[in-house]
Each structure stands twice: as structure tokens, then as C-alpha cells.
Amino acid sequence: MLLFNAVVLSVLVMLILSVARVHVIISLFIASLVGGLVAGMGVSGTMVAFQDGLAGGAKIALSYALLGAFAMSVAHSGLPRLLANWIIKKLRNADESNSARVARSAKWGILGGVLVMGVMSQNLIPIHIAFIPLLVPPLIGVMNELKMDRRLVACAITFGIVTTYMFVPIGFGRIFLHDILYKNIEEAGMAVEGVVNPMVAMAIPAASMAVGCAIALLVSYRKPREYEQRETSFSSNDDKPVDMKKVWAAVLALVACFVSQAVLTKMDSEADPLLVGALVGLCMMLGMRVVPWQQADDVFSGGMKMMSLIGLIMITAQGYASVLKASGQIEPLVQQTSAMFNGSKALAAVIMLVVGLIITMGIGSSFSTLPIISAIYVPLCVTLNFSPMATVAIIGTAGALGDAGSPASDSTLGPTAGLNIDGQHDHMRDTVIPEFIHYNIPLLIGGWIAAMVL
């Protein structure tokens, strides 16, 4: 039975434990054991596969730790305080007739800013979620002042990230659409490169994401939400004037960090752009004396602590994904669901999308899901007479499903890292569940419509 498939059981255990407020690292570890044992790998085999996968997350964790240190050094420069104080001053100096308008402008300015940055992080400035710890934590005090529901910000960030790479074939979008999606479909025997425009094929799924984002921003989380104004490593009650020399030095370091990542990405360098960019930024901050040598250890340690939890979750998620792949239960899951089609294109599209959702929820990466499902989905689509464009829409959507809404995905971990700086933003309840509802459900519907009409 489908329910007794190791992958399905493992993902269900992970989700149930996470919703029950069991720590996500413990949830991933227990889910790994369940998946391995149900697949017949035994405790030893499961642990070996889990341990082998841990190394895959080490580089990411180190990159995020260094990025956290860089973010803290930027905060030390006074740049975030300058921005936050300017917004707060505008709010407090506004008279009663203008205060509501100023607050509304500030709220939508913040939301628009993080959304645009999310879009640019996938192409123009290809740094993925690296912008979040630099941009979001310094604005937490302003968000509290505005009584902004942080679920709004989480949804805005993730929309900018996920919709962009699944729709726009530039930067990370080129990797997702051409280097992975099209490449694997071609290898499975269907010609799509130069035949199918990815922006046309993925237009309906992308539009469904936009609908989900609009509902989140305009309906679900538009009401004010109270947060305590807590002291954090990014907040300061210091009334001393900001040193503008340090501010401009921080701006230069930020530009250098972004440019170095963009150049390495453009060159297809094997060096990790995120790691190199963080190192470049840190070196510039030290070299320009934004962070004095005698304070560097405390500043950098504080930043690394900020990102350490996210790094540990990413390492654990890699181990979990390794167990799922080693279980040998992913292909049987796809094959078992294929037998349920009975020649129905509508039913086939739904089942293929749901299976993609389950796999991505478990692995935590849409980029890793595509190679797994393409080899089996392409022959099925050919047999059921789906057009090449519909095939691209089905497989592309099946891969992207679950990225926004998986506890182990960087599309959810990134926003949590920035928004939980003061401990008032829960990963499952304030990021994962809202994004699952507002993005995965519309994306499932949009993917099915695309499969039927293209």
C-alpha cells in the first residue's frame, strides 16, 4: 500500500512531530530512523546513510555562519540603525492626520523591499537567501513598531525567491529550468530545449503563486499583531550619532560581497559564491576598521550564533535526504502511484504533482527532486499524450511543490533566520504552515490547470 511506503511514512512522521512542536532537528532525525527502518535498512544502515549525508550540509552551514558574522559587522557599522531610526522618526514625527498614511507607507515599503530583494537574489544579484540576515534583522524593531505580522514578511520573501527561479530562466532560474529540468527531460527522451518556452509553460503555476501571495498579504495577515520590543544584537539604545564613515564602508563591503558572488556565479566557478562573498565582506569590514580588532571576536561570534541553528538544521536535512535516497523507496512510490491513473489525464496530473510535493517536502530541495521524478514522469506523460509544454509544467511544478512549506527547505529556513532574531517567530507555525497553505495549495491547483490546458 502507498501509505506504507518508507518515504511517505517518514515525511508524515516529520510533519506530525514538527507541528507538535518537537524541535525540527529531532523531527528530522526521528523521521530518518523511521524511513530507514521501514525500508529495511536497519539501524546501522540508516545511521551510515544519515552520517554520509551530513557532509553535504557542512559547506552550507559554514557559509551561513560566516554570513551571520558579516551581518553582525554590518549592524556594528550603524547602517541598519540609521535606516531603522529614520523610519521610526518618520512614524513618530507624523501628526495624527498623517500617521496612518506614514505607517502604511512604511509597512508596504518594507514588504515591497524584501519581495524585490527576493526576486533579485535569484538573478540580478544571485545570492539566494544570503540577503535575509543582512536586511531583515535590523528592521525587526521597525516591524514591531508598525505591529506588522511577520508571517507577511516570510510569505513575501519566499514568493520572491521561489516564483522567480521557477519562472524566470536567468541566474538560479536558468539552473532550475534549463540545466536541471530541461536536461533531465531530454535525457528521458523528450525534446523540449528550443521547442518549449519555459516562461510560457510555467506561467500558470507562477500566477497561482502570485494569487497565494496576494491572499497572504491582503487577507490572511493584514491585521496588526503585537510583539514585545526586545533587545537584540541588532538593536541599540545608544543615542550617539552614527559614524557615516563606517556606514559608507559597510555599503562598500556589501557591494563587494554581492559583486564577488555575482562574478563567481557568472563564471560557473566551483568555489562557493556564498562562502567567498561572506569572506570578502568580512575582510573589508576588518580592513576598513568598521569593526575594531579588539571587538572583532565578540562581534563575529554573535553573528555566527545567530545563524548556527539554521546551519544545524541544514546539515541534519542533508542527512535525512541521504536516507530517503538510500532507502530505494522513491522510485517504487512513483511507480505505485502511476498504477492509479487508469488512463485519466486529470487524475494522473494530480497524482504526479502530489508525489512531487511529498518528495520535495522530504528532501527539502526542489532542485534535487527534478532528477528523481523526471526519468519516470516523462514516459508517463508521453503515454498519456501530454504535450511537451504540459510535461514541462507538470514536472517543473512537481519539483517546486513543497519548497515553500518544507521544514527543511532553505526557502523557509532563511526567512525564519531573519525574523526570529528576538525569539518571537516560530519556524513551523509562523513560516512553514503559512507558506504551505498560501503557496503549495495554489501551486497544486495551478500546476493541474496548466497540465490540462497546455
Which sequence ranges carry the predicted segments?
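Alpha-helical transmembrane segments of multi-pass membrane proteins
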Residues: 98-121, 146-163, 188-198, 345-359, ...
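Central hydrophobic cores of alpha-helical transmembrane segments
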Residues: 28-34, 153-160, 372-377, 395
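Transmembrane alpha-helix interface/packing and boundary motifs in multi-pass membrane proteins
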Residues: 13-21, 117-126, 160-168, 260-264, ...
